[in-house]
Structure formats: structure tokens, C-alpha cells
Amino acid sequence: MSQNTPSLRELEHHNAFVERHIGPNDAEIAQMLDVVGHASLDAMTDAIVPAKIKSPAPLALPESMTEVQALAKIRAIADKNTVLRSFIGQGYYGTHTPNVILRNILENPAWYTAYTPYQAEISQGRMEALINFQTLCADLTGMEIANASLLDEATAAAEAMTLAKRSAKSKSDTFFVHDAVHPQTLELLRTRAEPMGIVLRVGTPAEALEAEAFGLLLQYPDTFGQVGDYKALVDAVHARGGLVAVATDLLALTLLAAPGEWGADIVVGNSQRFGVPFGFGGPHAAFMACRDAYKRSMPGRLIGVSIDAQGNPAYRLTLQTREQHIRREKATSNICTAQVLLAVMASMYAVYHGPEGLTRIARRTHRLASILAAALRNAGVQVGGDFFDTLHVTGVHADEIHAKARAAGYNLRAIDSDSVGISLDETTTRADIVAVAAVFGASLDVDALDASTADALPAGLLRQSAFLTHPVFNTHHSEHELLRYLRSLADKDLAMDRTMIPLGSCTMKLNATAEMIPVTWPEFSQIHPLVPADQALGYKELIDTLEAMLVECTGYDAVSLQPNSGAQGEYAGLLAIRAYHRSRGEGHRDICLIPDSAHGTNPASAQMCGMKVVVTKTDANGNVDVEDIRLNAEKYSDRLAAIMMTYPSTHGVFEEEVVEICEIIHKHGGQVYTDGANMNALVGVAKPGKWGSDVSHLNLHKTFCIPHGGGGPGVGPCAVKEHLAPFLPGKLGDNGPVGMVSAASFGSASILPISWMYIAMMGREGLRKATQVAQLNANYIAKRLAPHFKTLYTGRNGLVAHECILDVRPLEKTSGIGAEDVAKRLIDFGFHAPTLSFPVAGTLMVEPTESESLHELDRFIDAMIQIREEITAIEDGRLDREDNPLKNAPHTATAVTASEWTHAYPRELAAFPLASLKQSKYWPPVARVDNVYGDKNVMCACIPVDAYKDDEVEA
């Protein structure tokens, strides 16, 4: 082989994916390093990261795989799962995902790469979809308002419990739980209640009649399928000052009287059976609906209707002062990431089928269940009555039944030794009920029994009220119509398929197509979370190997993948610390130190664990004030439980004293919790588990490439050192000392292949390079913008970590232009704004990630420089201080093409501030949204059609 001939190994190009994932190529990296002032990535990293925390050796992970190799490897893992027909129920049901929704939402980056809709003007499409979801949930439950999704049904039930606690007139500390709620719901309630001083009492509805409690949770239909009449019970609870929460099934409510109609105050549930697969437990969009009186205490995101600057209807996140990122230690919930992508799917399932289609699916499911029940009874098998879709079969040898069922290709619910459950669903066929009947020794003539069998729903609980009457649910029933509706919504929004999203602390990096492909494979998507272990061997291998990968990346000793959001990972980590102290006879340790720059979820999670939050100071350079930490650690030495700190800090710098801080906390008996929100600055460079940290949560939807989905799904694994490992979240049936923090034992399991694929395709060297280029991109932006905008905080050598805070506060004094004006003006350039006013009010925090190319970085920089020039023009008097392109941003196509233009600047400056925008232009669908109007006039359901009537247009 000649000297110039590349080797076969080079030609195999094993690091091809690394080059696809990382935006700048090597030549561009060299060019950018020159701007930053360093000769190499390693030299730059040495100048950024404190030497005492740097990892001495490369990650002990395999080298990178190609996309083809990784897909083949994960296909082999998936094939170890066994897909049977699962009629287990217990909150999870088979469903058909309409292909138009599968392809155009779940597999469409216009939907799955979007961020939480904080910037209303560029999020109108997905907020309309979420308004549809809220309307769906409110209509079917008979409530006045519903939120834009929660993490899972069990979490929603726990949130209902705490909502009832703070809203009920009763002063009792007892929450009464129906003994026929789903088991996973009861386990999570136990986890959540004890640290908050809530006493759970579990019993029958009859026992609840006389109970003194601030709240009651009912399941309707219950976990065994029974449909109960609870009107008298609800009245009794109300008479004693309590509130009633109901966990329900949306499909059943197309046939059954809505809980709101018989007195419920709060209704929760799971929308999974509206087109979202099992996924071994998630992700699925739960919901909460409640009476209007409780809307300001309701957890989670809430989409409302306001008006824009031109008086047109516009959607926005409403009542945000309820949320954890604002209320912090006064919050009563730490919900942040929810399940927006799945809520969008469920809403469009309802839009596609409409009320008649949903009712038809429900009637067919109930009809099949009624026919099967009749066949079993005819064969002498005992079956409960008054059901929707679930049969409780008693008096059988359960082990024998399960063995026969599995041999026939079916999973039934394991209840006890002499009873089983059978939950039918949209996917059930005639052949299925014939086969299941045969398992019990029953024969079944479907047509004959159909003609002779009555429905099994109680006559007094049949739904009489209309639902989903809004035109959106009665229009898009052909595939063409839905396809075009989805396209029209996607076109209103900015997601990563169109532009960089430079949100600080959010890590909006590439969600590669190859990573997404396994998610919809039946071997992952069609596995019920409660199948026998031998049917989920592929999932076991996937979970075990991913946990090992994360252990290696973090330096910890054990990982739980159960938390289904970053906030839940925080909660799990703090519960582990709490349980550890209690195991050592130090349960009195209840003080949690939290810097004032911390994420809002940190203090919210701490108070949910029964801890008292003590806020520590930040110094003038943006660093955690070590002396203030030392003083507080000494002051609360006997009670110190933990410190929660983000590293690198939320101010975008690597603090030099992190090891010293860990030593201070440990000296006083506390544990160190390191928030993993900024792990994208660390992978392959430093490991928190090696510098003294005891526990972290990670964000797989940030660092490890699960897409944000417009506000979820997420996965927030909890990683711990060995001494905390026994206190990781328990699993259903094996609860452990802490209990469950999510409904499913492995959380949102079906999206774990995304992170597995990312790590496998990047390999040890690719992961380190990704971290370094993330640092480079942030510093390149900071250096290029330095003559125009000051970077508020830098670390040693004048460098930032992986994000930078641009300070626009001085400009507000000289021009009247604030950070929000800059954020809105960026929309005219086709950009999603950076993070606004966090962690410092009046600033913009920029995190470009490693995936953005030099071209895209320069496009953003050019936009920011042009904005600075416009601010200069205001300062100089060339642009009016009030009537200027920043104050009036964003500019809609309607505004700039109107026959009359009254502004003191030209239309071209409004629409095309840079010439390059004439080649490709994003037009926001609405002008600047009025936040004050939206909070004063709360409306959280579909907009009446007449609100869209056009004003008269001049000829």
C-alpha cells in the first residue's frame, strides 16, 4: 500500500456520525479557535475547566459506531423483546396511532425539535394543538379548565392530592384513597405524601363516607373495571370541607357521565389510549382538569388566549406566576417538562376521529368486552358487572390461565392466585375475544352473542351531555384535511428544523434521525410496562447498558432511569439524600442550601421532600459565594441535609472552588447534589461523581439528545454514589425504602433508545469533542459579540463554559430597549430568542451547543450586530425611541403589506433587516402578544370561530 493510500480502517469512517453531529468541521474549528485565542480544543478546555476536576483518562466507552452499525446493534437488542397482545390494562391500553399522526407529528422534526412555548409569537401552532388538548380534557371530564399535560397518571394523582391539600376548607392532614385505584398510583401517592406530612388512608368508598379527610381520590372506572356511582359520596366529602379528585379514562367518558357532572373538583388521567403506544410505560401525556376556582393553584403549563398588538387572538402560556421557576421555594409542585409531544398526538387523534369517531371506538370496545363477558359467564366463569372495557374474572387458577393465554399469544393482568383481569381496547378484534374465551374453556359465537347481549354500563351513569362540539373536532376527518391542518400549524412555529434555538440552559442540540428511528419499532413501542420479565429482555439489556454508559460519563456508581423529567430526577435525588440520613438516625437533617442563581425547580423539589430551603449568595463575578456557604454550613451544621448547586453554574462559568464546597458540606454532615442541567459542558472532560458530588440528575433531553418535543417528553435519570444507591426509586412490587417517583418502573422507557444511539454513535472521543465544541461555540459567540454586547460573567482567562449571558441592561438606560425587545426582534431575523431574564433579569443567555455550524453561528451573530446598530440609531436619535423596529417587533406579513404604514421607519427595515432574509424568511403568525391582557382574561379552551373573522379589507 502506498504512503498516500488511506487504510481500510480510515475508509470505513467509523466516526462519520461524529462529523454529522458536530456542526463546525475541523477547518472551521481552527478558524474559530483563532478568534477565541487558543491553538487547539485541548488548550481551550484547559483554560476553561479547573485542573482539579478534569478527568485524567478518556471515557471507558467503545469507539464510535456508524449509523448503520448502531441501528443493527439496537435492532438485535430490540429483537430480544417478545411482542404479545397485551390485555393487561391497569392504565395502559392498546391503540392504533393513525399513520398521518405517526408520520407528521411523532416522526416530524417540526414538532419534536421545538422547545417549550415561552416565546408565544413563534409557538402559535403547537399552542393551538395544546389548546385542543385542554379542550378535549375539559370537555370529556366535565370540568371548566384543563392543563397542557402532566408526566403520567400517577404523578397527576399526586399533584391532585397536593392541590386538594392547599385548596380544601378541611384542616385534616388525611387524604383518603379508593382501594381500587391503579397500584402504581397508590405507590406514588405514598412516596409523595410522607415527606409532606400527609397521611394516606386507603379504603372502600363506603368507608370514605365517614372519613375525616381534606380530599378523596376515586378511580372511575376503577382498576378492576367496575363503574361506580359516587354522587352521594362526593356530597358527603364536600359537606366536611374536602375536595374530590377522580382518576379516569378519557375513552370511557365518551359513554359515561363526566365526573364534573356528579361533583368532582379535580379530574386526572392518562391520554395514552388516544393514539400513543404502550412504550413499556411511557412517555404518555397525563392531564389534570379542575374547577375554575382552582386554576391559580393548578400545577403544570396552561395555554391561554390573549390578543396581539394588532388586536388579533393569540395564544400564550398563561398564569405563569403559578409555576415553579417563578415561585421557587414557595412552589407546591416542581413540574417543568411535561409531555407536550404526546399531548399533541392525543389532541390530533381526537381531532381526526371527532366525537362520533371516538364514541364509535368506545362503543366497539365496550361491545367486545360485553360479548366476551357473556361467553365467559355462559361457561360458568365469574365476571364482575358494570364495566366499560375491563373484566375482573374470579374463581380461576390464575397461573394456569396465564400460561394458556401466553401460549395463545396474550398477556392478561395478574391480580392474585384466583383472579385475572382482561382489558380490551381499540386494537381488539373478533378473533381476539374468541381466542381469549378459549383460554377459559369457553366457546364464542360473536354474532349470536352480539344479538343477545346487553351493554354492561349502568343506566344511571350514561353520558347525556355533548362534547367536542368546537369545529376543530368536526372538520379534519379526511386525511387530506388533517395533513394540511398539521402542516399549517407547523408552519406557524420555529423549531430546530428551521433554525438554531440558542436557549441558555436548554441544550437544543441535534436530535439525529438515526437516533429517533428505533422509537417506533413495535419491539419497543408495543411492550406493556407490566409484561413478564422474559418478554422484556431487550429492554433489560438496553436499560442496563445505558445505565452503565451514564455511570461512566458521570463518575457515579448507580443510575435510575425511572424519573421522567429533570425535575423528577431532582426529586428522586433529594429523596435518596433524605432516606440516607434517616437510615443513619439523622432524620432531623432538613436544611438544603441553594444558591440564589439556581434553577427554580431546585427549591421547589427541596420543599416537596420536606426540606427547608436556605438561599446562599452569589458573588460579583457570578460565582457561588463560598464564604456564605461556609457560614451557613456552620450555622446549620446539625441540621444540614444537602446543598443543591448547578455545575458549571447557571451563570455559564466553571467555578474554581467546587471541590472546596463539597468538602465544606461533607464536613458538616451534608450531601452534595449537583444539578446536571449543564452536563453538556462536562461529558468526557470532568465527572461530578469524582470531584466530591454525591448525586446528580441528568437531562437525557438535553445532553443526550432526546428531543424537547415542544415541552416534553424528557428523561431525568438520577445518578448516585454507592452509599446512596440503596435509596434510588423503587419499582412496582419492589418498592424499597424510597418508593416510586414515576408511574412506570423505568419511566419513559420507549425513548431511551435515543440516548443509547447517541452515545453509541459518538463513542468516547466523539463525546469529548462534542463537549469541547459546545464550549468553543459559546466562546466564539461571546468573543464576536464583545464589541456590541457585554458578556456578564466569565471564568478564568476570560472564557465562559458552554453558554454566555449577554447583558443588555445598560442599553435600556440609553435607548429604552430591553431584553424582551431584543428577543422579539430576533424573530424578524428568523431566530428563536435566547433564554430571557434567567438567571439574571434583563439579560439574554445563549447556548449554541456543538451541533450548530459556523454558518449558523455567524447568522445569529450578524442578527445581533444589526440589532445593536438599531439600538445605536435609537440612541443617536435616528430612530424614534418609541416607534422603532425593536419596540414593534415582531412584524407580521399582514402588518408590512397593509395598505397603510404609519411607522417612522421603512417597511423593508421591519421585514428584511438583513438582505439574506429575502432568500428565506420566517413570518410570525401574530404580532407581539399582550401578556397582561392574557392573565386578566383567562381563557384556556378553543377560540370561538367568530373571533377569526377578518376585518374588512380595502379594495
From Swiss-Prot:
Modified residues (N6-(pyridoxal phosphate)lysine): 702
One annotated GO molecular function: glycine dehydrogenase (decarboxylating) activity
Gene Ontology CC terms, in alphabetical order: cytosol; glycine cleavage complex
Catalytically driven reaction(s): N(6)-[(R)-lipoyl]-L-lysyl-[glycine-cleavage complex H protein] + glycine + H(+) = N(6)-[(R)-S(8)-aminomethyldihydrolipoyl]-L-lysyl-[glycine-cleavage complex H protein] + CO2
Keyword Signal on entry: no
Keywords recorded for this protein, A-Z: Oxidoreductase, Pyridoxal phosphate
GO biological process assignments: glycine decarboxylation via glycine cleavage system
Necessary cofactors: pyridoxal 5'-phosphate
Signal peptide span: none
Function: The glycine cleavage system catalyzes the degradation of glycine. The P protein binds the alpha-amino group of glycine through its pyridoxal phosphate cofactor; CO(2) is released and the remaining methylamine moiety is then transferred to the lipoamide cofactor of the H protein.
Quaternary structure, from the entry: The glycine cleavage system is composed of four proteins: P, T, L and H.
Name this protein carries in UniProt: Glycine dehydrogenase (decarboxylating)
Gene assigned in the entry: gcvP
